[in-house]
Design a protein with these regions (language model features):
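Hydrophobic alpha-helical positions that pack around
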Residues: 140-252, 258-263, 273
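Short, conserved beta-turn/loop elements at beta-strand boundaries and strand-helix junctions
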Residues: 23-29, 262
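Hydrophobic alpha-helical hairpins/lids featuring a short glycine-rich hinge
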Residues: 32, 38-104
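Hydrophobic beta-strand signal
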Residues: 1-3, 22-23, 253, 270, ...
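Conserved mixed alpha/beta catalytic, RNA-binding, or beta-rich assembly cores of soluble enzyme
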Residues: 72-84, 95-127, 189, 219-309, ...
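Generic structural motif
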Residues: 8, 14-23
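Short hydrophobic beta/alpha edge segments that flank linear recognition/processing sites
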Residues: 1-8, 25, 36-41
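Ferredoxin-type iron-sulfur electron-transfer modules in oxidoreductases and energy-metabolism complexes
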Residues: 291-307, 317, 321-386
Length: 386
């Protein structure tokens, strides 16, 4: 471990390589924002003796609930769907709340990304053990694995493997973006609606990503911290696409090089998928725990069209999965009217990008909504701290 969590909603960081620390400071992340970082000169590939690197499947877990959560916390496990919320926090159910169901998110609805799909196909047995461990940590009797119908091989594979787990059920889901959003997934699987401003635990659910269940298995059964993850490297501009098991800290440029290098007509590098991903300003930035994919877009497809005036068509309202009014939030955000933004529930926005995608006026709706949401979050934190 090279960096310890400094609060409850925080996660430990482990070195993914053996070597010598050469610098402690700040480096630009993928978006160009300077972040705390530790630089290590790689020296060989030595592992701690307590880490079980064998491929043997360890199904039995005799740890108590508290021991499971402690091991997950020590391993630095976070949500690997992109939000990177510490997993041990999700497993620590607040007083007065009760977890009834665990839902494993195997939807992966973001276009181009297939990392979770490969994990389900190639590490399905380990995933199921991880799911069972998470169920025990939560004290729930039922776990569901939600997978969209466009992954029939994963559905069939996990159904066969889960025959020995009567409390785990694979649920095929309609192909619909953004089906992988927590609240959308809960409604699709359980038929329960998370209230505005609420959390999944408010309706008795805890959601974990498919990749997270694998990381939990490795942490609890193999004593392995979160030092690597599967990343989709893709895009029509690339000569070689793949899902790669990547050490945390690997430069994004190394993944692009593996894919054949940067084509001349590349217009944009995206960290994530085309809907919710963000443009990469620094290709030398490291892969992080939340890096699900690196997407290269050709120049022709990456140029934004000139925004026009809103024509009040309400298409953005019609496609919003949260029932919000994106055009209204866009206007408030542009005018820095944060009280109004809070009043129209901007914090409920899941940043799926449907509004921007469908806007006939090419307005940068999501860009301004993200800015407004960030400012409202600051106001709410300040208010809570008083």
């Amino acid at each position: 471990m090279i960096s310890a969590a400094d609060g409850f909603v925080s996660a430990n960081v482990h070195s993914s390589v053996s070597g010598t620390v050469t610098a402690v400071g700040e480096v630009p992340d993928a978006g160009g924002v300077r972040r705390p970082a530790i630089t290590i000169a790689v020296e060989g590939d030595q592992w701690l003796d307590i880490i079980d690197r064998s491929e043997s499947l360890v199904k039995e877990c005799h740890l108590t609930r508290d021991e499971i959560i402690t091991r997950i916390k020590n391993a630095g496990i976070v949500g690997m769907g992109g939000a990177t919320f510490p997993t041990h926090v999700k497993l620590s159910v607040p007083v007065g709340k009760k977890a009834e169901f665990l839902i494993v998110n195997g939807v992966e609805c973001e276009p181009f990304l297939t990392a979770d799909h490969r994990v389900m196909l190639e590490r399905g047995a380990e995933m199921l053990v991880g799911t069972d461990i998470l169920s025990r940590a939560l004290g729930v009797d039922k776990a569901y694995i939600g997978i969209e119908n466009n992954k029939p091989d994963a559905i069939e594979h996990l159904r066969q493997l889960s025959a020995g787990y009567p409390d785990i059920e694979v649920v095929p889901l309609r192909v619909r973006y953004p089906q992988g959003g927590e609240k959308q997934l809960i409604e699709a699987v359980l038929g329960r609606e998370v209230p505005s401003g609420g959390l999944p635990i408010d309706v008795g659910a805890v959601v974990q990503n498919a990749g997270t269940t694998l990381a939990v298995y490795e942490a609890v059964q193999k004593n392995k911290p979160l030092i690597e993850r599967v990343v989709t490297v893709t895009g029509r501009a690339m000569s070689r696409t793949a899902n790669l098991k990547v050490r945390i800290g690997t430069p994004i440029s190394s993944l692009i090089e593996y894919g054949g290098g940067m084509p001349e007509d590349t217009g944009k590098i995206v960290n994530g998928g085309p809907m919710m991903g963000r443009a990469v300003a620094n290709p030398e930035a490291p892969v992080t725990k939340g890096t699900s994919g690196i997407l290269l877009i050709r120049r022709k497809g990456s140029v934004r069209k000139t925004p026009q005036s809103c024509i009040k068509c309400a298409k953005c309202v019609g496609v919003c999965p949260m029932g919000l009014e994106p055009y209204l939030m866009y206007g408030f955000a542009r005018r820095l009217r944060y009280e109004e933004l809070e009043a129209v529930h901007i914090t409920d926005c899941i940043e799926c990008g449907c509004c921007s995608y469908t806007c006939p006026a090419y307005l940068p709706l999501l860009d301004y909504i993200r800015l407004g949401k960030s400012e409202v979050a600051k106001i709410l934190r300040a208010r809570k701290a008083r």
